[in-house]
Amino acid sequence: MNFQRMTDLNLAGKRVLIREDLNVPVKNGVITSDARLRAALPTIKAALEKGAAVMVFSHLGRPVEGEPKPEQSLAPVAAYLTEALGQEVKLFTDYLDGVEVEAGQVVLLENVRFNPGEKKNNPELAQKYAALCDVFVMDAFGTAHRAEASTEGVARFAPVAAAGPLLAAELDALGRAMQTPEKPMVAIVAGSKVSTKLDVLNSLSGICDQLIVGGGIANTFLAAAGYNVGKSLYEADLVETAKQIAAKVSVPLPTDVVVADASQINFEDFLGSLAAAQAVIKKVEDVTANDMILDVGPETAKAFANILTTSKTILWNGPVGVFEVDQFGEGTKALSLAVAQSDAFSIAGGGDTLAAIDKYNVADQIGYISTGGGAFLEFVEGKTLPAVAVLLERA
């Protein structure tokens, strides 16, 4: 993908406006997870080292536009950045008519979603953002799938628009997996419903050599192959769709599964009741009417791990079982370790996937971990991300 990169630009003495994703969880004024802030720091530091006058902006939460509330302010983020950067990072609440910032200095602009017209990508607002800077840097991959004034609009009107290091790394990794994958390529797509991942499955079926499915998605494919899935979560209306996908790409199905007796499960307290449920390993052909499939069995996990070992590119989205409960997490654990130990280029994304990577402590062995969530899925679906499209146009 051809786009301008912040790292290639001369920023000395330039006013640089950086769109980061600083949408961190804040409870009673305290940031409870700083992962996104830690991810953004290298970009801010790089702009400072290049001699720029740096303005950073972001959204936080879902405020009503034009109705700022203190609990949705970026004030805790300004305090965090002040400490992390070793210089005062002032928070500007009134910035649309201009901001005073010197070269080598960083300021933070208040929550963009306080500004009427932000979410609707109002061109007048986008032009006001653009007028603040000489260079606009888009570095928030997690919001790149939304055409908003601070993501797509400003990039149209700024004198120069470039991708920051975080966004560039994300696009490079996704491009490597989706556009020029080294073969053989294997994708792991798991989740509760085929319907929510249908575009992902269709897109990947045209790219990868093997498609490993897990969770409720696998149950729908098992039902399509004529197996009884008992009380397991599956979508009867998508059995034909599963057959069509399986006709396009190799979908290795589980040969054994881990089940629980559905009568022992309280669906109001699903994970709590599962913790007390007995896990039973069964061949897929032995699943009975009252069984609920909650993981792949050890034989299947080993077979899937062997597929991953011989692949050159792995894209992973979703755990193959209810890994939050240990007795139904062995399949996800085995696949996590197989991805980690494979020599393939691996990219992983999606909230549950990241939680599994954390649980099994394999983050350092995954080629690239996408922080994008919805943006990651839309890219994998083959959709154009508006904030990326404008950078490509302006390159």
UniProtKB/Swiss-Prot annotation:
Concerning PROSITE patterns, the annotation shows: PGLYCERATE_KINASE
Which SUPFAM superfamilies does UniProt cross-reference here? Phosphoglycerate kinase
GO BP terms, alphabetized: gluconeogenesis; glycolytic process
According to its UniProt record, what is one Pfam family this protein matches?
PGK
EC number per UniProt: 2.7.2.3
Q: Name one GO cellular component term.
A: cytosol
UniProt-annotated binding residues for substrate: D21, L22, N23, R36, H59, L60, G61, R62, R113, R146
**Amino acids binding ATP:** K197, E324, G350, G351, D352, T353
- Where is the protein localized? Cytoplasm
**Sample GO molecular function, one term:** phosphoglycerate kinase activity
Q: What is the reaction catalyzed?
A: (2R)-3-phosphoglycerate + ATP = (2R)-3-phospho-glyceroyl phosphate + ADP
Source organism superkingdom: Bacteria
**Top EC group:** transferase
Q: In which pathway does it act?
A: Carbohydrate degradation; glycolysis; pyruvate from D-glyceraldehyde 3-phosphate: step 2/5
- UniProt entry keywords in alphabetical sequence: ATP-binding, Cytoplasm, Glycolysis, Kinase, Nucleotide-binding, Transferase
What quaternary arrangement does the UniProt entry report? Monomer.
Q: Which family does it belong to?
A: Belongs to the phosphoglycerate kinase family.
What protein is this chain from?
A: Phosphoglycerate kinase
What's the encoding gene here? pgk
